[in-house]
Protein backbone atom coordinates (compact mmCIF):
# COMPACT_ATOMS: atom_id res chain seq x y z
CA UNK A 1 0.00 0.00 0.00
CA UNK A 2 1.07 3.56 -0.58
CA UNK A 3 0.20 6.95 0.74
CA UNK A 4 -1.92 8.46 -1.99
CA UNK A 5 -1.16 12.06 -2.77
CA UNK A 6 -4.40 13.70 -3.89
CA UNK A 7 -3.20 17.32 -3.81
CA UNK A 8 -1.95 18.25 -7.27
CA UNK A 9 -1.11 21.78 -6.13
CA UNK A 10 1.46 20.69 -3.58
CA UNK A 11 5.09 21.17 -4.56
CA UNK A 12 6.07 18.45 -6.98
CA UNK A 13 8.88 15.99 -6.51
CA UNK A 14 10.16 16.36 -10.02
CA UNK A 15 10.06 20.15 -10.27
CA UNK A 16 11.28 20.82 -6.75
CA UNK A 17 9.22 23.98 -6.38
CA UNK A 18 10.70 26.22 -3.74
CA UNK A 19 9.30 27.18 -0.37
CA UNK A 20 7.70 30.49 -1.34
CA UNK A 21 5.34 28.59 -3.64
CA UNK A 22 4.44 26.22 -0.85
CA UNK A 23 3.28 28.25 2.10
CA UNK A 24 1.36 30.82 0.07
CA UNK A 25 -1.11 28.12 -0.97
CA UNK A 26 -4.73 28.51 0.07
CA UNK A 27 -4.88 26.10 3.00
CA UNK A 28 -8.67 25.91 2.89
CA UNK A 29 -8.57 24.34 -0.56
CA UNK A 30 -6.38 21.44 0.54
CA UNK A 31 -8.08 18.09 0.94
CA UNK A 32 -6.94 15.37 3.35
CA UNK A 33 -4.64 12.73 1.90
CA UNK A 34 -5.86 9.17 2.28
CA UNK A 35 -4.00 5.93 2.90
CA UNK A 36 -6.15 3.01 3.89
CA UNK A 37 -8.26 4.17 6.82
CA UNK A 38 -5.77 6.78 7.93
CA UNK A 39 -5.74 10.44 7.08
CA UNK A 40 -2.74 12.61 6.47
CA UNK A 41 -3.59 16.17 7.51
CA UNK A 42 -3.00 19.06 5.16
CA UNK A 43 -1.02 20.70 7.97
CA UNK A 44 1.56 19.05 10.21
CA UNK A 45 4.23 20.25 12.59
CA UNK A 46 6.28 17.81 14.65
CA UNK A 47 6.74 20.27 17.51
CA UNK A 48 3.04 20.85 18.07
CA UNK A 49 1.64 17.51 16.89
CA UNK A 50 4.13 15.30 18.73
CA UNK A 51 6.07 17.16 21.43
CA UNK A 52 3.12 19.24 22.63
CA UNK A 53 0.89 16.17 22.49
CA UNK A 54 3.07 14.30 24.98
CA UNK A 55 3.39 17.47 27.05
CA UNK A 56 -0.39 17.79 27.32
CA UNK A 57 -0.66 14.17 28.46
CA UNK A 58 1.94 14.84 31.15
CA UNK A 59 0.06 17.93 32.27
CA UNK A 60 -3.19 15.96 32.44
CA UNK A 61 -1.53 13.22 34.49
CA UNK A 62 -2.06 10.67 31.71
CA UNK A 63 1.64 10.09 31.18
CA UNK A 64 4.52 9.66 33.59
CA UNK A 65 6.70 12.80 33.57
CA UNK A 66 9.85 10.80 32.86
CA UNK A 67 12.63 12.37 30.81
CA UNK A 68 12.17 13.03 27.11
CA UNK A 69 15.78 14.14 26.75
CA UNK A 70 18.52 12.83 29.04
CA UNK A 71 21.85 14.51 28.35
CA UNK A 72 25.26 14.13 29.92
CA UNK A 73 28.89 14.96 29.25
CA UNK A 74 32.25 13.60 30.32
CA UNK A 75 32.51 16.01 33.26
CA UNK A 76 29.66 14.47 35.20
CA UNK A 77 27.06 17.05 34.22
CA UNK A 78 23.58 15.70 33.51
CA UNK A 79 20.37 17.30 32.32
CA UNK A 80 16.88 15.84 32.10
CA UNK A 81 13.86 17.45 30.46
CA UNK A 82 10.42 15.88 30.36
CA UNK A 83 8.11 16.70 27.46
CA UNK A 84 6.46 19.61 29.31
CA UNK A 85 9.85 21.19 29.93
CA UNK A 86 11.02 20.45 26.40
CA UNK A 87 7.85 22.01 24.99
CA UNK A 88 8.25 25.15 27.08
CA UNK A 89 11.97 25.68 26.44
CA UNK A 90 11.62 25.03 22.71
CA UNK A 91 8.90 27.70 22.62
CA UNK A 92 11.36 30.08 24.25
CA UNK A 93 13.86 29.08 21.58
CA UNK A 94 11.33 29.85 18.85
CA UNK A 95 10.87 33.30 20.35
CA UNK A 96 14.63 33.85 20.31
CA UNK A 97 14.78 32.92 16.63
CA UNK A 98 11.82 35.01 15.50
CA UNK A 99 12.08 37.78 18.08
CA UNK A 100 15.65 38.68 18.96
CA UNK A 101 16.98 37.30 15.67
CA UNK A 102 14.14 38.61 13.53
CA UNK A 103 13.93 35.49 11.37
CA UNK A 104 10.80 34.88 9.32
CA UNK A 105 8.97 31.83 8.10
CA UNK A 106 10.88 30.15 5.30
CA UNK A 107 14.29 31.53 6.28
CA UNK A 108 17.08 28.99 6.25
CA UNK A 109 19.14 28.41 9.37
CA UNK A 110 22.44 26.53 9.41
CA UNK A 111 22.84 24.61 12.67
CA UNK A 112 26.43 23.57 13.39
CA UNK A 113 26.54 22.27 16.94
CA UNK A 114 27.95 19.23 18.70
CA UNK A 115 25.74 16.93 20.79
CA UNK A 116 24.61 19.66 23.18
CA UNK A 117 20.99 20.16 24.35
CA UNK A 118 20.78 23.35 22.33
CA UNK A 119 20.89 21.34 19.09
CA UNK A 120 17.56 19.75 19.99
CA UNK A 121 16.12 23.08 21.16
CA UNK A 122 17.13 24.96 18.01
CA UNK A 123 15.81 22.22 15.75
CA UNK A 124 12.45 22.24 17.53
CA UNK A 125 12.47 26.04 17.59
CA UNK A 126 12.94 26.12 13.82
CA UNK A 127 10.06 23.69 13.36
CA UNK A 128 7.78 25.80 15.56
CA UNK A 129 8.67 28.96 13.64
CA UNK A 130 8.42 27.55 10.13
CA UNK A 131 12.16 28.02 9.64
CA UNK A 132 14.21 25.60 7.54
CA UNK A 133 16.98 24.05 9.61
CA UNK A 134 20.17 22.82 7.94
CA UNK A 135 22.29 20.58 10.19
CA UNK A 136 26.02 20.41 9.65
CA UNK A 137 28.88 18.64 11.37
CA UNK A 138 31.30 20.53 13.57
CA UNK A 139 34.10 18.85 11.63
CA UNK A 140 33.51 21.24 8.74
CA UNK A 141 36.23 23.65 7.75
CA UNK A 142 35.78 27.18 6.44
CA UNK A 143 35.52 26.05 2.81
CA UNK A 144 32.75 23.58 3.73
CA UNK A 145 30.85 26.23 5.67
CA UNK A 146 31.26 28.79 2.90
CA UNK A 147 29.85 26.39 0.31
CA UNK A 148 26.82 25.61 2.47
CA UNK A 149 26.05 29.18 3.44
CA UNK A 150 26.38 30.49 -0.10
CA UNK A 151 24.53 27.71 -1.89
CA UNK A 152 21.65 27.71 0.60
CA UNK A 153 21.46 31.50 0.98
CA UNK A 154 21.17 30.93 4.71
CA UNK A 155 19.89 33.89 6.71
CA UNK A 156 21.33 32.65 10.00
CA UNK A 157 23.82 30.26 11.50
CA UNK A 158 23.73 28.77 14.98
CA UNK A 159 27.13 27.51 16.07
CA UNK A 160 29.35 26.75 19.04
CA UNK A 161 32.93 27.55 19.94
CA UNK A 162 34.13 24.67 17.76
CA UNK A 163 33.55 26.50 14.47
CA UNK A 164 33.16 30.22 15.24
CA UNK A 165 36.55 31.10 13.78
CA UNK A 166 35.78 29.12 10.63
CA UNK A 167 32.43 30.93 10.31
CA UNK A 168 33.92 34.37 10.87
CA UNK A 169 36.54 33.68 8.21
CA UNK A 170 33.88 33.28 5.49
CA UNK A 171 30.87 35.24 6.77
CA UNK A 172 31.84 38.44 4.90
CA UNK A 173 31.50 36.47 1.65
CA UNK A 174 27.94 35.36 2.48
CA UNK A 175 25.66 38.23 1.48
CA UNK A 176 22.47 36.55 2.67
CA UNK A 177 23.80 35.80 6.16
CA UNK A 178 22.36 38.30 8.64
CA UNK A 179 22.43 36.52 12.01
CA UNK A 180 25.18 34.64 13.84
CA UNK A 181 23.88 32.99 17.00
CA UNK A 182 26.48 31.64 19.41
CA UNK A 183 25.86 28.73 21.80
CA UNK A 184 28.57 29.34 24.38
CA UNK A 185 29.24 30.56 27.89
CA UNK A 186 31.33 33.32 26.33
CA UNK A 187 30.40 36.31 24.21
CA UNK A 188 31.95 37.06 20.83
CA UNK A 189 31.89 40.21 18.77
CA UNK A 190 29.41 40.06 15.92
CA UNK A 191 27.46 37.19 17.48
CA UNK A 192 24.27 37.08 19.53
CA UNK A 193 24.50 34.88 22.62
CA UNK A 194 21.82 32.19 22.56
CA UNK A 195 21.98 31.29 26.24
CA UNK A 196 21.62 34.90 27.36
CA UNK A 197 18.68 35.48 25.03
CA UNK A 198 16.99 32.25 26.10
CA UNK A 199 16.89 33.34 29.74
CA UNK A 200 14.76 36.36 28.87
CA UNK A 201 12.57 34.72 26.22
CA UNK A 202 8.87 34.15 26.81
CA UNK A 203 7.60 30.55 27.00
CA UNK A 204 4.43 31.59 25.20
CA UNK A 205 4.57 30.92 21.48
CA UNK A 206 1.98 30.06 18.85
CA UNK A 207 3.34 27.30 16.63
CA UNK A 208 3.20 28.06 12.92
CA UNK A 209 0.60 25.91 11.16
CA UNK A 210 2.96 24.48 8.58
CA UNK A 211 1.62 22.75 5.49
CA UNK A 212 2.62 19.09 5.45
CA UNK A 213 4.65 19.60 2.27
CA UNK A 214 6.27 22.81 3.46
CA UNK A 215 10.05 22.83 3.60
CA UNK A 216 11.37 21.81 7.03
CA UNK A 217 15.00 20.85 6.53
CA UNK A 218 17.85 20.78 4.06
CA UNK A 219 20.55 18.15 4.33
CA UNK A 220 23.71 18.29 2.31
CA UNK A 221 24.58 14.93 0.81
CA UNK A 222 27.92 13.51 1.88
CA UNK A 223 29.58 14.22 -1.44
CA UNK A 224 30.70 10.66 -2.22
CA UNK A 225 29.55 11.12 -5.82
CA UNK A 226 30.35 14.77 -6.52
CA UNK A 227 29.93 18.07 -4.68
CA UNK A 228 27.31 18.15 -1.91
CA UNK A 229 23.73 18.56 -3.06
CA UNK A 230 20.95 20.16 -1.02
CA UNK A 231 18.33 17.53 -0.27
CA UNK A 232 15.16 19.26 0.86
CA UNK A 233 12.77 17.55 3.27
CA UNK A 234 9.27 18.64 4.21
CA UNK A 235 7.44 18.45 7.53
CA UNK A 236 5.64 15.50 5.98
CA UNK A 237 8.67 13.55 4.76
CA UNK A 238 10.36 13.83 8.16
CA UNK A 239 7.68 13.92 10.85
CA UNK A 240 4.75 12.08 9.28
CA UNK A 241 7.02 9.35 7.94
CA UNK A 242 8.35 8.86 11.47
CA UNK A 243 4.80 8.49 12.81
CA UNK A 244 4.23 5.73 10.28
CA UNK A 245 7.38 3.65 10.58
CA UNK A 246 8.68 4.17 14.12
CA UNK A 247 7.42 0.73 15.10
CA UNK A 248 10.62 -0.86 13.76
CA UNK A 249 12.35 0.12 17.00
CA UNK A 250 9.89 -1.74 19.22
CA UNK A 251 10.14 1.13 21.69
CA UNK A 252 7.59 2.61 24.07
CA UNK A 253 7.25 5.47 26.60
CA UNK A 254 9.19 3.58 29.28
CA UNK A 255 12.25 2.97 27.08
CA UNK A 256 15.47 4.89 26.51
CA UNK A 257 17.29 5.02 23.18
CA UNK A 258 20.87 6.08 22.53
CA UNK A 259 21.87 6.95 18.97
CA UNK A 260 25.57 7.66 18.55
CA UNK A 261 25.73 9.90 15.53
CA UNK A 262 27.12 13.23 14.46
CA UNK A 263 24.42 15.91 14.63
CA UNK A 264 25.08 16.78 10.99
CA UNK A 265 24.08 13.32 9.80
CA UNK A 266 20.47 12.44 9.00
CA UNK A 267 20.79 9.33 11.19
CA UNK A 268 20.85 11.67 14.17
CA UNK A 269 17.47 13.25 13.54
CA UNK A 270 15.96 9.87 12.69
CA UNK A 271 17.33 7.91 15.64
CA UNK A 272 17.80 10.67 18.18
CA UNK A 273 14.80 12.87 17.52
CA UNK A 274 11.92 11.82 15.28
CA UNK A 275 11.49 8.07 15.70
CA UNK A 276 11.89 7.86 19.52
CA UNK A 277 9.82 10.95 20.34
CA UNK A 278 6.95 9.80 18.14
CA UNK A 279 6.70 6.85 20.55
CA UNK A 280 7.20 8.95 23.68
CA UNK A 281 10.60 7.34 24.24
CA UNK A 282 13.41 9.00 26.16
CA UNK A 283 16.38 10.08 24.04
CA UNK A 284 19.75 9.61 25.69
CA UNK A 285 22.61 11.82 24.53
CA UNK A 286 26.27 11.82 25.54
CA UNK A 287 28.37 14.76 24.36
CA UNK A 288 31.35 12.52 23.48
CA UNK A 289 33.55 15.17 21.80
CA UNK A 290 35.78 12.29 20.76
CA UNK A 291 34.50 8.74 20.51
CA UNK A 292 35.74 6.69 23.44
CA UNK A 293 34.70 3.01 23.42
CA UNK A 294 35.38 2.58 27.14
CA UNK A 295 33.09 5.49 27.98
CA UNK A 296 30.35 4.03 25.80
CA UNK A 297 30.65 0.63 27.47
CA UNK A 298 30.58 2.15 30.96
CA UNK A 299 27.46 4.16 30.12
CA UNK A 300 25.70 1.13 28.65
CA UNK A 301 26.54 -0.77 31.82
CA UNK A 302 25.30 1.82 34.29
CA UNK A 303 22.41 3.64 32.61
CA UNK A 304 18.95 2.22 31.76
CA UNK A 305 19.50 2.29 28.00
CA UNK A 306 17.34 -0.24 26.17
CA UNK A 307 18.27 0.46 22.56
CA UNK A 308 21.54 1.39 20.88
CA UNK A 309 21.90 2.70 17.33
CA UNK A 310 25.20 3.50 15.67
CA UNK A 311 27.35 2.97 12.61
CA UNK A 312 29.07 -0.42 12.19
CA UNK A 313 32.40 1.23 13.00
CA UNK A 314 31.14 1.91 16.53
CA UNK A 315 30.43 -1.76 17.12
CA UNK A 316 33.81 -2.70 15.66
CA UNK A 317 35.54 -0.31 18.05
CA UNK A 318 33.57 -1.65 21.00
CA UNK A 319 34.55 -5.18 20.03
CA UNK A 320 38.21 -4.25 20.35
CA UNK A 321 37.64 -3.80 24.10
CA UNK A 322 37.44 -6.53 26.72
CA UNK A 323 33.66 -6.94 26.77
CA UNK A 324 33.84 -9.61 29.47
CA UNK A 325 34.39 -6.77 31.95
CA UNK A 326 31.00 -5.23 31.19
CA UNK A 327 27.38 -6.23 31.68
CA UNK A 328 24.47 -4.54 29.95
CA UNK A 329 21.45 -5.27 32.17
CA UNK A 330 18.98 -3.03 30.31
CA UNK A 331 20.15 -3.26 26.70
CA UNK A 332 17.91 -5.48 24.57
CA UNK A 333 18.12 -4.01 21.05
CA UNK A 334 21.06 -2.98 18.89
CA UNK A 335 20.70 -1.34 15.48
CA UNK A 336 23.24 -0.30 12.91
CA UNK A 337 23.05 2.08 9.96
CA UNK A 338 25.10 4.30 7.71
CA UNK A 339 27.19 1.61 6.02
CA UNK A 340 27.11 -2.12 5.46
CA UNK A 341 27.28 -4.24 8.60
CA UNK A 342 29.89 -6.93 8.20
CA UNK A 343 28.67 -10.44 9.12
CA UNK A 344 31.85 -10.86 11.15
CA UNK A 345 30.91 -7.84 13.29
CA UNK A 346 27.39 -9.17 13.79
CA UNK A 347 28.60 -12.61 14.80
CA UNK A 348 31.31 -11.31 17.15
CA UNK A 349 28.92 -8.93 18.88
CA UNK A 350 26.36 -11.66 19.42
CA UNK A 351 29.00 -14.08 20.70
CA UNK A 352 30.31 -11.57 23.23
CA UNK A 353 27.08 -9.85 24.32
CA UNK A 354 24.29 -12.26 23.42
CA UNK A 355 22.65 -9.47 21.42
CA UNK A 356 21.96 -9.31 17.70
CA UNK A 357 22.65 -6.19 15.66
CA UNK A 358 19.74 -5.33 13.38
CA UNK A 359 20.49 -3.34 10.28
CA UNK A 360 18.67 -0.30 8.95
CA UNK A 361 19.28 1.07 5.47
CA UNK A 362 18.47 4.37 3.85
CA UNK A 363 19.85 7.56 2.44
CA UNK A 364 19.58 11.29 2.96
CA UNK A 365 16.89 11.58 0.32
CA UNK A 366 14.60 8.81 1.60
CA UNK A 367 15.28 8.36 5.29
CA UNK A 368 14.97 4.79 6.52
CA UNK A 369 14.13 2.60 3.52
CA UNK A 370 14.75 -0.96 4.73
CA UNK A 371 15.17 -2.42 8.20
CA UNK A 372 15.38 -5.54 10.30
CA UNK A 373 12.87 -4.80 13.04
CA UNK A 374 12.82 -6.44 16.46
CA UNK A 375 10.23 -8.95 15.30
CA UNK A 376 12.21 -10.02 12.22
CA UNK A 377 14.92 -12.62 11.98
CA UNK A 378 18.47 -11.44 11.38
CA UNK A 379 20.12 -12.71 8.20
CA UNK A 380 23.85 -11.87 8.08
CA UNK A 381 24.68 -9.78 5.06
CA UNK A 382 21.08 -8.64 4.52
CA UNK A 383 19.56 -5.19 5.01
CA UNK A 384 16.09 -6.39 5.90
CA UNK A 385 12.87 -5.66 4.04
CA UNK A 386 11.30 -2.45 2.76
CA UNK A 387 9.67 -0.29 5.40
CA UNK A 388 6.07 0.93 5.05
CA UNK A 389 5.08 2.83 2.92
CA UNK A 390 8.01 2.13 0.61
CA UNK A 391 8.00 -0.27 -2.33
CA UNK A 392 11.65 -1.14 -2.88
CA UNK A 393 12.63 -3.34 -5.80
CA UNK A 394 15.70 -4.47 -7.70
CA UNK A 395 15.47 -3.25 -11.29
CA UNK A 396 17.38 -3.63 -14.55
CA UNK A 397 18.78 -0.93 -16.83
CA UNK A 398 15.37 -0.38 -18.43
CA UNK A 399 13.56 0.02 -15.10
CA UNK A 400 11.97 -3.43 -15.10
CA UNK A 401 11.57 -5.24 -11.79
CA UNK A 402 13.90 -8.22 -11.52
CA UNK A 403 12.87 -11.52 -9.90
CA UNK A 404 14.36 -12.70 -6.59
CA UNK A 405 17.97 -13.78 -6.84
CA UNK A 406 18.85 -11.46 -9.70
CA UNK A 407 21.34 -8.65 -9.14
CA UNK A 408 20.37 -5.15 -10.19
CA UNK A 409 19.94 -1.58 -9.02
CA UNK A 410 18.06 -1.05 -5.78
CA UNK A 411 15.27 1.44 -6.36
CA UNK A 412 12.24 2.98 -4.68
CA UNK A 413 8.95 3.23 -6.57
CA UNK A 414 7.85 6.85 -6.88
CA UNK A 415 5.35 6.62 -9.78
CA UNK A 416 2.47 6.78 -10.22
CA UNK A 417 2.24 7.41 -6.47
CA UNK A 418 4.89 9.24 -4.54
CA UNK A 419 5.32 7.80 -1.03
CA UNK A 420 5.51 9.80 2.15
CA UNK A 421 9.07 10.04 3.37
CA UNK A 422 10.52 10.94 -0.01
CA UNK A 423 12.41 14.20 -0.05
CA UNK A 424 11.09 17.13 -2.10
CA UNK A 425 14.09 17.17 -4.41
CA UNK A 426 17.51 18.75 -4.79
CA UNK A 427 17.15 22.47 -4.20
CA UNK A 428 17.65 24.55 -7.36
CA UNK A 429 18.63 21.41 -9.24
CA UNK A 430 15.56 19.73 -10.79
CA UNK A 431 17.71 18.21 -13.55
CA UNK A 432 19.80 16.35 -10.98
CA UNK A 433 16.62 15.16 -9.30
CA UNK A 434 15.13 13.95 -12.58
CA UNK A 435 18.38 12.28 -13.63
CA UNK A 436 18.09 9.88 -10.71
CA UNK A 437 14.77 8.48 -11.91
CA UNK A 438 14.56 5.38 -14.08
CA UNK A 439 11.07 4.54 -15.24
CA UNK A 440 8.85 4.52 -12.16
CA UNK A 441 11.74 4.31 -9.70
CA UNK A 442 14.10 6.50 -7.73
CA UNK A 443 17.57 4.96 -7.85
CA UNK A 444 19.07 4.38 -4.41
CA UNK A 445 22.59 4.28 -5.82
CA UNK A 446 23.29 0.74 -4.66
CA UNK A 447 23.43 -2.67 -6.28
CA UNK A 448 21.57 -5.47 -4.57
CA UNK A 449 19.72 -8.76 -4.69
CA UNK A 450 16.26 -9.42 -3.28
CA UNK A 451 15.56 -12.87 -1.91
CA UNK A 452 12.26 -14.75 -1.80
CA UNK A 453 11.49 -13.40 1.69
CA UNK A 454 11.87 -9.80 0.58
CA UNK A 455 15.25 -9.26 2.25
CA UNK A 456 17.82 -7.21 0.36
CA UNK A 457 21.47 -8.19 0.07
CA UNK A 458 23.74 -5.20 -0.47
CA UNK A 459 26.30 -5.70 -3.27
CA UNK A 460 27.92 -2.26 -3.24
CA UNK A 461 27.50 1.27 -4.51
CA UNK A 462 26.46 1.37 -8.16
CA UNK A 463 29.81 2.78 -9.19
CA UNK A 464 31.72 0.54 -6.77
CA UNK A 465 30.92 -2.75 -8.50
CA UNK A 466 34.07 -4.39 -9.88
CA UNK A 467 33.86 -6.18 -13.22
CA UNK A 468 36.90 -8.43 -13.56
CA UNK A 469 37.09 -10.86 -16.48
CA UNK A 470 33.30 -10.90 -16.66
CA UNK A 471 32.87 -11.52 -12.95
CA UNK A 472 30.88 -8.83 -11.15
CA UNK A 473 32.29 -8.40 -7.66
CA UNK A 474 30.71 -6.38 -4.86
CA UNK A 475 33.36 -4.66 -2.73
CA UNK A 476 31.52 -5.37 0.50
CA UNK A 477 31.88 -9.11 -0.06
CA UNK A 478 35.66 -8.82 -0.23
CA UNK A 479 35.73 -6.36 2.66
CA UNK A 480 33.65 -8.75 4.76
CA UNK A 481 36.15 -11.52 4.10
CA UNK A 482 39.17 -9.37 4.90
CA UNK A 483 37.63 -8.08 8.12
CA UNK A 484 37.45 -11.62 9.44
CA UNK A 485 41.25 -11.70 9.62
CA UNK A 486 42.73 -10.36 12.89
CA UNK A 487 45.34 -8.31 11.02
CA UNK A 488 42.69 -6.06 9.46
CA UNK A 489 41.25 -3.11 11.38
CA UNK A 490 39.62 -1.39 8.42
CA UNK A 491 39.56 -1.90 4.68
CA UNK A 492 38.22 -0.47 1.45
CA UNK A 493 38.02 -2.43 -1.79
CA UNK A 494 37.98 -0.84 -5.24
CA UNK A 495 38.71 -1.70 -8.85
CA UNK A 496 42.22 -1.27 -10.22
CA UNK A 497 43.19 -1.22 -13.91
CA UNK A 498 44.68 -4.41 -15.36
CA UNK A 499 45.90 -4.95 -18.95
CA UNK A 500 44.49 -8.48 -19.15
CA UNK A 501 41.37 -8.52 -16.99
CA UNK A 502 40.53 -4.83 -17.60
CA UNK A 503 40.15 -4.37 -13.86
CA UNK A 504 40.99 -6.37 -10.78
CA UNK A 505 40.19 -6.21 -7.09
CA UNK A 506 42.43 -4.00 -4.98
CA UNK A 507 42.23 -3.73 -1.20
CA UNK A 508 43.47 -0.85 0.91
CA UNK A 509 44.11 -2.24 4.37
CA UNK A 510 44.63 -0.58 7.75
CA UNK A 511 46.53 -3.03 9.94
CA UNK A 512 46.08 -3.79 13.61
CA UNK A 513 49.03 -2.45 15.67
CA UNK A 514 50.44 -5.91 16.40
CA UNK A 515 50.79 -6.62 12.65
CA UNK A 516 52.55 -3.41 11.64
CA UNK A 517 55.99 -4.99 11.98
CA UNK A 518 55.14 -8.03 9.84
CA UNK A 519 56.64 -8.52 6.41
CA UNK A 520 54.12 -6.88 4.08
CA UNK A 521 54.73 -9.15 1.10
CA UNK A 522 54.11 -12.19 3.25
CA UNK A 523 51.09 -10.59 4.88
CA UNK A 524 49.66 -9.80 1.46
CA UNK A 525 49.81 -13.48 0.54
CA UNK A 526 48.25 -14.46 3.86
CA UNK A 527 45.32 -12.10 3.33
CA UNK A 528 44.84 -13.23 -0.27
CA UNK A 529 44.71 -16.86 0.78
CA UNK A 530 42.36 -15.98 3.60
CA UNK A 531 39.89 -14.35 1.21
CA UNK A 532 40.08 -17.35 -1.10
CA UNK A 533 39.26 -19.57 1.85
CA UNK A 534 36.11 -17.74 2.92
CA UNK A 535 34.55 -16.62 -0.36
CA UNK A 536 34.66 -17.39 -4.08
CA UNK A 537 38.35 -17.40 -5.10
CA UNK A 538 37.81 -15.06 -8.04
CA UNK A 539 36.99 -12.30 -5.57
CA UNK A 540 40.35 -12.25 -3.84
CA UNK A 541 42.30 -8.96 -4.00
CA UNK A 542 45.07 -9.33 -6.56
CA UNK A 543 46.49 -6.07 -5.25
CA UNK A 544 46.87 -5.07 -1.60
CA UNK A 545 48.12 -1.73 -0.33
CA UNK A 546 48.71 -1.13 3.36
CA UNK A 547 47.79 2.36 4.56
CA UNK A 548 47.65 4.15 7.91
CA UNK A 549 44.11 5.42 7.33
CA UNK A 550 41.36 5.65 4.74
CA UNK A 551 39.84 8.81 3.26
CA UNK A 552 36.43 9.56 4.74
CA UNK A 553 33.72 12.15 4.33
CA UNK A 554 33.03 14.51 7.22
CA UNK A 555 30.26 12.12 8.29
CA UNK A 556 32.68 9.21 8.52
CA UNK A 557 31.88 7.31 5.33
CA UNK A 558 34.80 5.75 3.48
CA UNK A 559 35.33 7.51 0.15
CA UNK A 560 35.87 4.60 -2.21
CA UNK A 561 35.33 7.00 -5.11
CA UNK A 562 38.36 9.05 -4.08
CA UNK A 563 40.52 5.95 -3.78
CA UNK A 564 39.31 4.66 -7.14
CA UNK A 565 39.91 7.97 -8.93
CA UNK A 566 43.47 8.16 -7.63
CA UNK A 567 44.11 4.50 -8.46
CA UNK A 568 42.95 4.81 -12.06
CA UNK A 569 44.85 8.07 -12.54
CA UNK A 570 48.16 6.68 -11.29
CA UNK A 571 47.86 3.09 -12.52
CA UNK A 572 45.65 3.37 -15.57
Swiss-Prot record:
Q: Which InterPro entries match?
A: AMP-bd_C (IPR025110), AMP-bd_C_sf (IPR045851), AMP-binding_CS (IPR020845), AMP-dep_synth/lig_dom (IPR000873), ANL_N_sf (IPR042099), Mitochondrial_ACSM (IPR051087)
Name the UniProt record assigns to this protein = Acyl-coenzyme A synthetase ACSM2, mitochondrial
Quaternary structure, from the entry = Monomer.
Q: Which reaction does it catalyse?
A: a medium-chain fatty acid + ATP + CoA = a medium-chain fatty acyl-CoA + AMP + diphosphate; benzoate + ATP + CoA = benzoyl-CoA + AMP + diphosphate; hexanoate + ATP + CoA = hexanoyl-CoA + AMP + diphosphate; butanoate + ATP + CoA = butanoyl-CoA + AMP + diphosphate
Arranged from A to Z, the UniProt key words for this protein are: ATP-binding, Fatty acid metabolism, Ligase, Lipid metabolism, Magnesium, Metal-binding, Mitochondrion, Nucleotide-binding, Transit peptide
What the entry lists under PANTHER family is as follows:
ACYL-COENZYME A SYNTHETASE, ACYL-COENZYME A SYNTHETASE ACSM2B, MITOCHONDRIAL
Q: Where does substrate bind?
A: 364, 472
Question: What residues form the membrane-spanning segments?
Answer: none
User: Which family would the database say this protein is a member of?
Assistant: Belongs to the ATP-dependent AMP-binding enzyme family.
